[in-house]
A protein has these predicted regions:
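Basic, amphipathic N-terminal segments that precede the first structured/catalytic domain
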Residues: 162-191, 355-364, 368-371
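Solvent-exposed soluble domains appended to multi-pass membrane proteins
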Residues: 200-555
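Transmembrane and membrane-interface helices of multi-pass
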Residues: 2-183
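Generic detector of well-ordered alpha-helical segments enriched in charged/polar residues
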Residues: 89, 108, 120, 132-133, ...
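Short extracytoplasmic/periplasmic juxtamembrane "stem" segments immediately C-terminal to an N-terminal membrane anchor
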Residues: 106, 184-199
Length: 555
């Protein structure tokens, strides 16, 4: 009798411990990204213990415990809910889903090679993960739960929990609001826009005595968080030492003591195209550029440079939204535009190698800098050259073993670390090479992180995330450089000012020249208040487009 009691107590204790370990695994899987084949041996042992106990106690003999006809239903539903959650985790680590307007605007664009790569990465990440977790949870529900009803109830609870966390992690109501209101059909007047937008044609813009050239470099996802803690970042070891030194030795707005400077992401400026649009026009990208006629009449710094005789070239080495970029810069009077196909041909790159290394035809940063050098060797002055890097793109960068080799090439965090390290190194090499060029002394170089990193690796929960800004070889000394708070809209007048242009009133678009003492809208209003006003601008731009169409018809 006592032996039976002791046996039951031992079985109960083992069962409780095993169930606790299994439930811990379920929770960890649910809230964190579980990588295939890296599951704790303790979890596997716990499942085996439950399986053995289930057999010894003959639970499997109970009525309705095991029906073969129910297995496909349980397997399919379980795989579906686990894949749904895995997909959400992947998307949150890859895209800025908190910016509903940007996501919906991006989805309006044609499906390109970069989008295919994202789909490929999504499937390669989520399918193996889902398969492994599904097998383990399938064993869990069959060992621990003794009927199909209970198993389906578990799956239902899993699904409901996922939907609840979708509403917590993603601003679903913002998506619903935007889709139901359709900005393209909603016309409204914005007092904020009218009072704060400065039309470049309405103010005096004076050229310097000698026109200065411009090299504008957008570094993919490069934020100050990649620096070490001493310099305002979040890393134990500095991933961008060369960029950090450049920021310290040159002008970097927002710097403070040993911390390098950075800009804030405001509404309508959280992806590569939206930031270029915003920094060029001083107007946030909150409505579709192609479908909003009035935006084509607003003047960017590219149009201003065009009016003053500048030769202007733009290129990007990756196909992501290339046609969108191309149409925008041509509309803004850029003379020559080159895409990945052009770079591949001119640099004589092997397409098969590119696809093998990165999954699609994209030109890595080291080759993009080479292409920039070839252009600068032949371009006539005065000129502006704008180009983008790509290697540090979310979710884990584009690892190049020829730059820095890591032991575990499947470690996503290490991939991103060495990728950031390589971009910093390649940028520095490029800038050093420019110093020997005849045009260098008369050329302002502006370096931006195009936006904050869209994933969570290395940056999660860091409160002070900002995109990098560096102004090199400029003709002015800023009145105030430290502790400045600014966003993308302020880059429109600041870029021109860095080239020696004088702007009466120190404002263009919605932006403020950071070389002046004037306060930016972020400094005046705060970022949250500014974002609320920016979100209302879409209706005003539709309103102005309506008036434009009406005036054109009357003419």
């Amino acid at each position: 009798m006592q032996n039976n009691k002791l046996k039951k107590i031992i079985i109960l204790c083992l069962k409780i411990i095993a169930i606790e370990e299994c439930l811990t695994f379920v929770v960890l899987h649910y809230f964190f990204e579980i990588k295939p084949f890296t599951i704790s041996p303790i979890v596997i042992v716990s499942f085996l213990v439950l399986f053995i106990l289930n057999y010894l106690t003959k639970n499997y003999q109970k009525k309705d415990y095991f029906k073969i006809s129910h297995i496909p239903l349980v397997v399919i539903l379980l795989f579906f809910v686990i894949h749904l959650r895995a997909g959400i985790i992947w998307a949150l680590n890859t895209f800025p889903l908190n910016d509903a307007n940007m996501v919906l605007l991006t989805l309006q664009e044609p499906f390109d090679d970069f989008a295919y790569l994202m789909v490929k990465q999504y499937l390669e990440t989520t399918i193996p993960q889902t398969a492994v977790v599904s097998i383990i949870l399938l064993l869990f529900v069959y060992v621990l739960l003794n009927s199909t009803k209970k198993r389906l109830a578990f799956i239902g609870m899993y699904f409901i929990t996922t939907i609840v966390f979708v509403f917590i992690d993603i601003p679903v109501l913002n998506y619903i609001y935007i889709l139901s209101n359709e900005p393209e059909k909603q016309s409204s007047y914005s007092k904020f826009f009218v009072e704060n937008y400065v039309n470049p044609d309405s103010v005096k813009i004076t050229l310097p005595e000698e026109k200065r050239n411009l090299i504008l470099i957008y570094l993919e996802s490069l934020e100050t968080t990649f620096a070490d803690k001493e310099h305002g970042g979040n890393q134990d070891s500095n991933l961008i030492p060369e960029i950090t030194e450049l920021a310290k030795e040159n002008i970097s707005f927002g710097k403070h003591e040993s911390h390098i400077g950075g800009g804030l992401d405001a509404s309508g400026s959280t992806s590569t195209f939206t930031t270029m649009h915003t920094r060029s026009l001083g107007i946030p990208h909150i409505v579709n550029y192609r479908n909003t006629p009035i935006l084509h009449y607003y003047k960017s710094f590219y149009k201003i440079l065009n009016e003053n005789g500048y030769k202007q070239i733009f290129f990007q080495g990756n196909p992501g939204l290339y046609n969108q970029f191309r149409n925008f810069v041509i509309d803004q009077k850029v003379d020559e535009v080159y895409g990945p196909e052009d770079l591949i041909e001119r640099l004589d790159l092997d397409v098969e190698t590119l696809i093998k290394n990165q999954g699609y035809k994209t030109v890595q940063d080291k080759d993009a800098f080479k292409f920039a050098t070839t252009i600068l060797d032949t371009i006539s002055e005065p000129f502006s050259l704008t180009f983008f890097t790509i290697d540090t793109h979310a979710p884990h960068g584009m690892y190049d073993p020829d730059c820095i080799k890591i032991e575990n090439e499947k470690d996503a965090d290490e991939q991103l670390k060495v990728t950031a390290r390589c971009v910093s190194r390649e940028l520095d090499k490029f800038l050093i090479s420019l110093k020997s060029k005849t045009f260098y002394e008369n050329t302002s170089i502006v370096i931006f992180g195009d936006h904050r990193f869209m994933g969570t690796r290395l940056v999660k929960d860091f409160p002070d995330r900002k995109w990098v800004n560096i102004f090199i070889n400029v003709s002015k000394i800023p009145s105030v450089e430290e502790k400045r708070r600014f966003s993308d809209i302020d880059m429109f007048p600041t870029i021109l000012s860095a080239m020696g242009f004088s702007i009466k009133g120190n404002k263009l678009g919605l932006g403020t020249d950071l070389f002046s003492e004037e306060k930016t809208l972020v400094e005046k209003m705060g970022l949250d208040s500014l974002n609320k006003e920016i979100d209302k601008i879409s209706g005003h731009l539709v309103y102005e487009s309506y008036l434009l169409k009406k005036n054109l018809k009357e003419k």
